Amino acid sequence: MKILLVHRQTKTVDKIKSVLSSCNPVVLHTESGLDGLLTSRIEHFDVIICGTDLPVVTGFELIRSVRTNSINRQTPVVIVCDEVDDKTIHLGQALDVLAMLPTKELDGLAEIVIQQVKVTPDRDWSELTSGSKAL
């Protein structure tokens, strides 16, 4: 499972990686929304997990751009924020977000990812293992 993790707080990033360790993920971490946005435009991920208070480009701007101009248009997104309020819920719904979690409830993240994220095989890897091409 390939995960793009865009969050600037080291403590939260470490907690997310720890919670998801049972999924054996490959996690690519960026601290700024701009780096996350650029990464999402060139590489496919099975899920994107992002914070809302990112430098340069906010989490909501990142998701909006991913949904309109990215190879990850259909990729599930989980928002991690300090507090989930009405504004966050409405923005998340408008951006078709899979889930919104407060940082204090990160233990539920693994369950959400395991139950609702479909892992897509890497096309290049499946071509190599299918036996259709000679090496």
For every predicted segment, state its role.
Residues 32, 58-61:
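Acidic catalytic/metal-coordinating carboxylates
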Residues 10-28, 35, 95:
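Two-component/phosphorelay signaling modules centered on CheY-like receiver
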Residues 121-135:
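CheY-like receiver
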Residues 1-11, 16-20, 48, 78:
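Conserved acidic segment of CheY-like receiver
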Residues 43-54:
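Active-site beta3 strand of CheY-like receiver
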Residues 44, 71-76:
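His-Asp phosphorelay/catalytic-motif detector in bacterial-type signaling
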Residues 38, 60-73:
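Short amphipathic alpha-helix used as the core "switch/output" element in two-component signaling
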Residues 61, 81-101, 107, 111:
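Alpha4 helix (beta4-alpha4-beta5 surface) of REC/receiver domains from two-component response regulators
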